[in-house]
Amino acid sequence: MSRTGKKPISLPEKVDVKFEGLSITVKGPKGELQRTLPNGVSLSKDENFIFVKPINEKRQSREMHGLCRSLVANMVEGVSNGFTKKLEIVGVGSRAQVKGKTLVVSAGYSHPVEVVPPEGITFKVENNTNVIVTGPDKELVGNEAAKIRAIRPPEPYKGKGIKYQGELIIRKAGKSGKT
């Protein structure tokens, strides 16, 4: 039995959970999330806790136990507090700005790159070089942050590019000249 899966998920106030079979819907102050869980688990609710249990001791059920518990816990966390990812743009002339809901990134190309957010995701820019991606869905926030980083990944020689805040870029030495 999964150690992660054994832990009950506590429901904060203002969070409402409904499930039919393997389909779960979580509503909260930050939005509403819906997901269909894989086969092999069952959900039960007791007062302010949700329990995820494997339906049998087969390998697939045991594999999905911890995963499903984490997915549901992330949904509850997302609709109550939300998730954020912060990115930094490093380099001369590289900057970002928000036009409407679209993020426009100037990252050294001949044209600015536009990133349109999916529903529920918002972009915020501070100081033209710090981008903040927020939303209730952890997976979607991470995917959008990865798309923005992929526009110009950091290079190892000068460290220029788009990186996550706090990400360590391993630097390389440049060419060594003749001695």
UniProtKB/Swiss-Prot annotation:
Similarity-based family: Belongs to the universal ribosomal protein uL6 family.
Subunit structure as annotated in this protein's UniProt entry: Part of the 50S ribosomal subunit.
Recorded GO MF terms: rRNA binding; structural constituent of ribosome
Function: This protein binds to the 23S rRNA, and is important in its secondary structure. It is located near the subunit interface in the base of the L7/L12 stalk, and near the tRNA binding site of the peptidyltransferase center.
Keywords: Ribonucleoprotein, Ribosomal protein, RNA-binding, rRNA-binding
UniProt keyword Phosphoprotein, yes or no: no
Record's protein name: Large ribosomal subunit protein uL6
Pfam families: Ribosomal_L6
Entry GO CC: cytosolic large ribosomal subunit
SUPFAM superfamilies the UniProt entry points to: Ribosomal protein L6
UniProt GO BP: cytoplasmic translation
Organism (species): Prochlorococcus marinus (strain NATL1A)
Gene3D superfamilies xref list: Ribosomal protein L6, alpha-beta domain (3.90.930.12)
Protein's UniProt keywords contain Transferase: no
